């Protein structure tokens, strides 16, 4: 089997060589970026952060994090409609990430726990899903919450 590779240009990483099998298709795009459908995940070395890099626009890359690393009790149920749309057949198919906003004052770094990015890693399909759950804020202040969790 021949694996197709292509070069993805990225403002953050320069040129990335990406296997077609690593490209994740977002049928509806990401809210506010609905025209962008193809993304690749790039891991930061020695960091809990990843990048969700658009394959179609070098200037669009989101910092993402596995929410379970910062909030071990994070949990939610996906409705059947989403499970079917992403063709999920087992929990092992699913990777969950949350978008991180890192402002100039890094102490104000926040994570969007309200709208996780759900990825079927086997089918390479993804979407950002808005949870109907008041436990999770749009702006979860990372350092403030990490400090309070350490003090407990």
Curated annotation (Swiss-Prot):
Keyword Transferase attributed: no
SUPFAM superfamilies, per database record: BH3618-like (SSF141457)
Record localization: Cytoplasm
Gene Ontology process terms (BP): bacterial-type flagellum assembly; regulation of translation
Pfam family of the protein (one): FliW
GO CC field: cytoplasm
InterPro entries reported for this sequence: Flagellar_assembly_factor_FliW, Flagellar_assmbl_FliW_dom_sf
Keyword terms: Bacterial flagellum biogenesis, Chaperone, Cytoplasm, Translation regulation
Similarity comment: Belongs to the FliW family.
Oligomeric form and interacting partners: Interacts with translational regulator CsrA and flagellin(s).
HAMAP family: FliW
Cited function: Acts as an anti-CsrA protein, binds CsrA and prevents it from repressing translation of its target genes, one of which is flagellin. Binds to flagellin and participates in the assembly of the flagellum.
Listed name of the protein: Flagellar assembly factor FliW
Annotated source species: Caldicellulosiruptor saccharolyticus (strain ATCC 43494 / DSM 8903 / Tp8T 6331)
């Amino acid at each position: 089997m021949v694996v197709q590779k292509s070069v993805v240009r990225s403002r953050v990483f320069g040129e990335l060589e990406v296997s077609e099998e690593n490209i994740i298709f977002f049928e509806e795009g990401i809210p506010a970026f609905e025209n962008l459908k193809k993304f690749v995940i790039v891991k930061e070395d020695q960091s809990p952060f990843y990048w969700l890099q658009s394959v179609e626009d070098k200037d669009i890359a989101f910092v993402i994090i596995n929410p379970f690393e910062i909030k071990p009790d994070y949990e939610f149920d996906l409705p059947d409609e989403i499970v079917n749309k992403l063709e999920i057949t087992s929990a092992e198919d699913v990777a969950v990430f949350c978008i991180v906003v890192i402002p100039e004052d890094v102490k104000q770094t926040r994570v969007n726990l309200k709208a996780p990015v759900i990825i079927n890693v086997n089918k390479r399909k993804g979407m950002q899903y808005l949870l109907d759950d008041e436990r999770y804020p749009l702006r979860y202040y990372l350092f403030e919450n990490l400090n309070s969790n350490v003090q407990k």
